[in-house]
Amino acid sequence: MSFNTIIDWNSCTAEQQRQLLMRPAISASESITRTVNDILDNVKTRGDEALREYSAKFDKTTVTALKVSADEIAAASERLSDELKQAMAVAVKNIETFHTAQKLPPVDVETQPGVRCQQVTRPVASVGLYIPGGSAPLFSTVLMLATPARIAGCKKVVLCSPPPIADEILYAAQLCGVQDVFNVGGAQAIAALAFGTESVPKVDKIFGPGNAFVTEAKRQVSQRLDGAAIDMPAGPSEVLVIADSGATPDFVASDLLSQAEHGPDSQVILLTPDADMARRVAEAVERQLAELPRAETARQALNASRLIVTKDLAQCVEISNQYGPEHLIIQTRNARELVDGITSAGSVFLGDWSPESAGDYASGTNHVLPTYGYTATCSSLGLADFQKRMTVQELSKEGFSTLASTIETLAAAERLTAHKNAVTLRVNALKEQA
């Protein structure tokens, strides 16, 4: 089924509807799983030596110094245009503003007289950021990860990227307060961050996107007792657009293509109650596609994408919630009114003037989002991902005395005698003091 095929949702059977919302299959092959496991064990055992060998093998680069020097970062900064630096500064300011606003006030309540309960927040002590290399370096992801890490107060923030590291990535790291940058890519970088080597410090939590090997490495280290936590499960990028008859077809098409050009496994979906709008968007996609440098990649993504005509906007919202897109764009005349009905989406973009690109780069929201249906249970990345919550309780003698019989009754009902004794001993001590 080509992207130009317009599908009438209500003419489909329940099984056909289910198939229409299926995502491109992702699974780590046995060979990837084994290869990654071997890389993890090798890096854990041999440290820096293994990292250099993998750089020569996979990146075709001889790495002498794994850590990027301050002079190299300064030189990279000099090579960038003032225009790009200014654009990064604007983006960082907006990201800072939005993520600073996410700080939670401390909770401090008396649940009953003499029983004080608190919730306090602490930063994750050390975090590692992974930034892919390649022809289009994702320096914007540095801004999205390092900025909230700094606001959260993480004491150690380090970054790994395949050599040679792009000037934009090095400058973004410096701009956002990353302390150390390392010439390490792939699954071996995840291993280095999870276990530590002579040069790369072990971190508590790893953030950032990557290829199938990086994704599998993150999964494996997150399940090892000697590994590290990770940000969220990863999957192909996706966007769903809800458009009414008043939407601009060229705008809708550009948003669909901005997602499709990410990779051949990306998925884009248009939901509209207007069949003419669907046709006009399909035509606009073809026109714009012809001008794109990454047209072949986008075409592959469009093979798994859909143009769906619905009964009305309410049905569009219902289908969107069922799919749970990473990015949801609502280009309707009543976009704000539809938000309360949205239950599953990574990030929502309202109206004609809120392209996905705004959130990808500079509006202030984070572009690290749950995908592949994980929006049903996972949140978009935010300040909380770089923090942990801790509870505190303090009972006075009076508070303890009042609550003691309740605790004893509950502990006895669960047959946890030591729990009950911890209370009874104190009750008896208070009686002796009286």
From Swiss-Prot:
One of its GO terms (molecular function) is zinc ion binding. It catalyses: L-histidinol + 2 NAD(+) + H2O = L-histidine + 2 NADH + 3 H(+). Zn(2+) binds at residues 259, 262, 360, 419. InterPro entries: Ald_DH/histidinol_DH, Histidinol_DH_CS, Histidinol_DH_monofunct, Hstdl_DH. Its EC number is 1.1.1.23. GO terms for biological process: L-histidine biosynthetic process. Binds 1 zinc ion per subunit. SUPFAM superfamilies: ALDH-like. Substrate binds at residues 237, 259, 262, 327, 360, 414, 419. Pfam families: Histidinol_dh. Its cofactor is Zn(2+). NAD(+) binds at residues 130, 188, 211. The active site is at residues 326-327. Keywords: Amino-acid biosynthesis, Histidine biosynthesis, Metal-binding, NAD, Oxidoreductase, Zinc. GO terms for cellular component: cytosol. Catalyzes the sequential NAD-dependent oxidations of L-histidinol to L-histidinaldehyde and then to L-histidine. PANTHER family: HISTIDINE BIOSYNTHESIS TRIFUNCTIONAL PROTEIN, HISTIDINOL DEHYDROGENASE HDH. NCBIfam families: hisD. Belongs to the histidinol dehydrogenase family. Homodimer. This is Histidinol dehydrogenase. The gene is hisD.
